[in-house]
Amino acid sequence: MPFGLIVIGIILAIAAYRDTLGELFSIIKDVSKDAKGFGYWVLAAVILGFAASIKPIKEPVNAFMILLMIVLLIRKRGAIDQISNQLRGS
């Protein structure tokens, strides 16, 4: 989780340095507006990220995080076909 926050901070710092924060936020708004239920997925990932810092439940939380990633990949129709097309180079 700290790594993710550092990456987000670096992205925001670069956008601020280039004076493109408005453009960055409009892109994020467009992406999140088109994806139904996007907020729920982000909230689930954040909760799992924080829960992973609790040592006794770290392994089950990691399993749920992997499951969340798999569901996000498969949820989008044609995602597997797009990935295979990209790997084939066509």
From Swiss-Prot:
Where's it mainly located? virion
Gene Ontology CC:
membrane; viral inner membrane; virion membrane
| Domain of life according to the entry | Viruses
Localization terms from the record: Virion membrane
The keyword Electron transport belongs to this UniProt entry's keyword annotation? no
The keyword Glycoprotein is assigned to this record: no
Q: Which residues cross the membrane?
A: 1-21, 37-57, 60-80
Instruction: Please report the record's description of how this protein sits within the membrane.
Output: Multi-pass membrane protein
Tell me one GO biological process term: symbiont entry into host cell
Keywords of the record, alphabetical order, are: Capsid inner membrane protein, Membrane, Transmembrane, Transmembrane helix, Viral genome ejection through host cell envelope, Viral penetration into host cytoplasm, Virion, Virus entry into host cell
What does this chain do?
A: Component of the phage injection machinery. Required for DNA injection in the membrane transformation event. Involved in the formation of the membrane tail tube to connect the virus interior with the host cytosol. Essential for viral infectivity.
- Protein name per Swiss-Prot or TrEMBL: Protein P18
Q: What is the lineage of its organism?
A: Viruses, Varidnaviria, Bamfordvirae, Preplasmiviricota, Tectiliviricetes
Give the gene that encodes this protein: XVIII
